[in-house]
């Protein structure tokens, strides 16, 4: 083995397999770009992002960990969200939940 060498099996990797998802249209109504990270509670994103927040409660972007989606001013785009896993307890972010979902 060589230090840092990876042994990867053939095939596809499916992220978040078996979890509930929802697709929402999101519009940036602000005058600045807004970037949302992979594990940010989407319900609590910047108020300049307009979308059905009730459907986003307990959800995050369905993208690879450590990545983000950027919304330019005036831009609308569809995003897929995936339900949060684990204890489903939310603290921090914008302080809109601060407890169990």
UniProtKB/Swiss-Prot annotation:
Enzyme kind, highest EC tier: hydrolase
Name of the protein this chain belongs to: Urease subunit beta
Pfam family, one: Urease_beta
The protein's annotated pathway: Nitrogen metabolism; urea degradation; CO(2) and NH(3) from urea (urease route): step 1/1
Superkingdom of this protein's organism: Bacteria
GO cellular component, one term: urease complex
InterPro entries the UniProt entry points to: Urease_beta-like, Urease_betasu_sf, Urease_subunit
Family the UniProt entry places it in: Belongs to the urease beta subunit family.
Regions that span the bilayer: none
Subunit structure: Heterotrimer of UreA (gamma), UreB (beta) and UreC (alpha) subunits. Three heterotrimers associate to form the active enzyme.
Any GO molecular function: urease activity
Biological process terms in GO annotation: urea catabolic process
PANTHER family: UREASE
UniProt keyword list: Cytoplasm, Hydrolase
Keyword Acetylation: no
EC number: 3.5.1.5
Location(s) in or outside the cell: Cytoplasm
Organism whose genome encodes this protein: Rhodopseudomonas palustris (strain ATCC BAA-98 / CGA009)
Catalytic activity: urea + 2 H2O + H(+) = hydrogencarbonate + 2 NH4(+)
């Amino acid at each position: 083995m060589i230090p840092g060498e990876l042994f990867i099996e053939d095939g596809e990797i499916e992220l978040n397999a078996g979890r509930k998802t929802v697709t929402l249209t999101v519009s940036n109504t602000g005058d600045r770009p807004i970037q949302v990270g992979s594990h940010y509670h989407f319900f609590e994103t910047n108020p300049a992002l307009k979308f059905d927040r009730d459907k986003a409660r307990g959800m995050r972007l369905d993208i690879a960990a450590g990545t983000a989606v950027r919304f330019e001013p005036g831009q609308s785009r569809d995003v897929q969200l995936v339900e949060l896993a684990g204890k489903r307890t939310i603290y921090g972010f914008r302080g809109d939940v601060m407890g169990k979902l």
